Design a protein with these regions (language model features):
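Amide-donor transfer/coupling interface in amidating biosynthetic enzymes
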Residues: 27, 60-155
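Short linear Ser/Thr-Pro motifs
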Residues: 1, 44-46, 103, 141
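Short, small-residue-biased leader/transition segments that mark boundaries at the very start
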Residues: 3-5
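Cysteine-nucleophile active-site neighborhood
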Residues: 8-75
């Protein structure tokens, strides 16, 4: 299971750099969609493995710190997303639910196009230039996820 792999961000960045893909990704001009750890890798730095990432988004990825006894990490399950903006988030209805599985999060930032609240509010999705991301899994999010993927294909 993906949750059992430690330091996924570090391992992924080592692979991308070893194959020159970090620079290739930065140079892409077509729409790009990063999902889950893909969102995190497009940020500046990740606490997961303490690794510098691709840096499209000028924000650092943080590890969840449970605040109350009911807070579970990894965050796993359905959660509501809100404050939707960007063509990626069109036609989703009000505050749709999407499926999340992650232990690290991207804080709210200038490029946040959807917000989610678990332990604290954070970025459920980002957009800058031709780069779009989802912390949640659209492929596991039913009709809402299907609409997001359709929106992406129409960009």
């Amino acid at each position: 299971s993906e949750m059992c792999i430690r330091d996924r961000a570090r391992e992924a960045m080592l692979y991308l750099k070893a194959h020159g893909l970090d620079e290739t990704i930065k140079s892409l001009t077509q729409p790009v969609l990063g999902i889950c750890v893909g969102q995190q890798l497009l940020c500046r730095h990740s606490e997961e493995g303490d690794v510098d990432c691709i840096g499209i988004f000028d924000v650092d990825v943080k590890k969840f710190v449970p605040q109350q006894h009911q807070d579970k990490v990894p965050a796993m399950g359905w959660n509501e997303i809100y404050n939707l903006s960007s063509p990626l988030m069109k036609d989703l209805g009000e505050n749709p639910y999407t499926y999340f599985v992650h232990s690290y999060y991207v804080p709210l930032c200038q490029e946040t196009i959807a917000t989610v609240n678990y332990i604290q509010p954070y970025s459920a999705a980002l957009h800058k230039d031709n780069f779009y991301t989802c912390q949640f899994h659209p492929e596991k999010s039913g009709k809402v996820g299907e609409q997001i993927l359709k929106n992406f294909m129409e960009l």
